[in-house]
């Protein structure tokens, strides 16, 4: 009788190897800077507020583009995401946060390609207004999407309540782990968010 254990097919081995290569740096970034603060360099802290008690995987959100096409299940996979969940009107505070996210991403230089920005409008009408506020010529990387989910399963229901005009950070595995409530000192926000992102990008470098 042949008792040799069955070996996984080469394709599966390759998939598992790629999965490990991608996920381990992200997990290491969490471990060093958030789960085990004692491992950080002296004086290092994070600027944003960590999601308590732990990072939360995003649910299946029904997000659609201006043509009504679904964004796809892989929207939040493979990149760090700065997410803004809009209200019925993108007033001055809303616009300030979108411009802030642009400046932060630009400051990352070559690492900017590893970070995406998303504006989630509550409906198609608000999305159309947002497209006029944030034209592609000024915000070529900004993903503008409308939330078509049913009540109780929308982005606004998932992300932390009571934090209007906040920026939410989602990791490349699709977990919401940090929130940045707006502050009066926009320069402090710019420096603080940028510093957090640079730490995470450095610790999770995979290419």
Task: Locate the predicted segments by residue.
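Short active-site neighborhood of thiol/selenol oxidoreductases, capturing the structured segment around
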Residues: 73-101
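Short acidic, S/G/P-rich loop/turn micro-motifs used as interaction or catalytic elements
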Residues: 88-93, 125-126, 185
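Structural microenvironment flanking redox-active thiols in thiol-disulfide oxidoreductases
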Residues: 96-137
């Amino acid at each position: 009788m042949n008792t040799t254990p069955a070996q996984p097919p080469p394709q599966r081995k390759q998939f598992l190897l790629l999965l490990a290569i991608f996920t381990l740096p992200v997990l290491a970034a969490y471990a060093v800077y958030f789960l085990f603060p004692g491992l950080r360099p002296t004086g290092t802290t994070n600027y944003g507020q960590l999601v308590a008690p732990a990072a939360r995987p995003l649910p299946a959100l029904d997000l659609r583009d201006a043509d009504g096409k679904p964004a796809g299940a892989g929207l939040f996979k493979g990149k760090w995401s700065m997410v803004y969940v809009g209200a019925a009107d993108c007033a001055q505070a809303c616009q300030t946060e979108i411009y802030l996210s642009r400046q932060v991403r630009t400051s990352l230089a070559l690492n900017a390609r590893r970070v995406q920005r998303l504006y989630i409008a509550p409906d198609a009408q608000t999305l159309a207004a947002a497209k006029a506020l944030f034209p592609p010529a000024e915000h070529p990387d900004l993903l503008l999407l409308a939330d078509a989910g049913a009540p109780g399963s929308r982005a606004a229901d998932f992300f932390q309540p009571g934090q209007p005009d906040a920026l939410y950070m989602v990791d490349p595995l699709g977990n919401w782990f940090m929130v940045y409530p707006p502050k009066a000192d926009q320069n402090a926000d710019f420096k603080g968010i940028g510093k957090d992102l640079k730490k995470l990008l450095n610790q999770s470098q995979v290419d």
